[in-house]
Amino acid sequence: MLHTLHSLRFVFVMLIVLSHLIGHGFDFGGECGVAFFFILSGFVLSLAYGSVRENRFSTRAFVRKQLLKFYPLHLLTMAVALALDARLGLYPEWGRIIPSILLVQSWIPSEQVYFFANGPAWFLADIVFFYLIFRCLFAVLNKMSIRQTIVASALLVIVYLLLGSLIPEDRVNYLLYVFPPVRVIDFAIGILLYRAYRSRHTESLRSWLNTCSPAWVTALELAVVALIVLTALIYPHIEPHIRCASMFWVVIPVVVFFFATIDKSGGLVTRLLTSRPMMALGSISFEIYMIHAVVKRIVQSTAMNVGIESNVWIAIVIILVTIALAFPVKIFFVDKIYIKASKFRYIDKNIEK
């Protein structure tokens, strides 16, 4: 496990949560956070089941294993969201419910469908698609030479930007932010990042960083953090078709690669990220992501009923309640179901063939 990346999950999931609490004034948080998790997924999956094990990787067993980790919580949060709707007299059509149950909602170009019930769950539909094509995509990307990779990447970026500029602004959110065949670019970047991470040049870089003083490593860490801050500052001035995804195709890989490389260094930021509290918070990042929208609805409704009008205090309560609930949800629901499934052989303990 790369401890720094594990803890960064919490940092970036909180950017997503804050974007949903603040609204359009902080769209950066949501789009940056989603890009991070898509790219990180490609990188971590490649790291875990990379070239040595490629020929023995079982897509079916792996997807089954991952579904048991997140699908029960997806159904639970959707049920809670539907119950909240029912209290308001809102009863959705089956045409909106079924795609979410089947995890294909992000393939349907309607906000009423892909943001249905527990809105953040659209992310799962994309991730499942990435898991299904991982083995093939990994093989293709790793057989390409460096020159082929550079040429193909340059052509892809040019085509993406040209076509993106032609998309009406009201369709950008779906076609460039949600649509799985487009967001697979982020996932592929994660796979390519794995190639760079496993290269001899990275080994040399890691060896050099290990000889640096903690103060020098801390300076480099703060420079990378500053890169994220700078990106946030220029974000509002960038065209929607760029800032929704492609804006992060450089900065997020830099963050992932850098912190993966210095995972065991003595820098201040690394020490913070590898601390026990941050590791614990990193372990509940998925649960935070899945429940925060439902918690937000419940807390806001309660605040309205008791006459609390301060948006700041409401946001603080939402964050604290979400984090507090995420721990028992993980321990007593997500992990418990997964462990029971392992005992009864509903999943393969070893996903390799």
Regions found by a protein language model. Give the residues of each.
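Structural signal for the C-terminal ends of transmembrane alpha-helices
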Residues: 46-53, 84-87, 136-144, 193-202, ...
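Hydrophobic alpha-helical segments with transmembrane-like composition
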Residues: 105-161, 198, 329
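Alpha-helical transmembrane segments of multi-pass integral membrane proteins
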Residues: 187, 191, 215-336
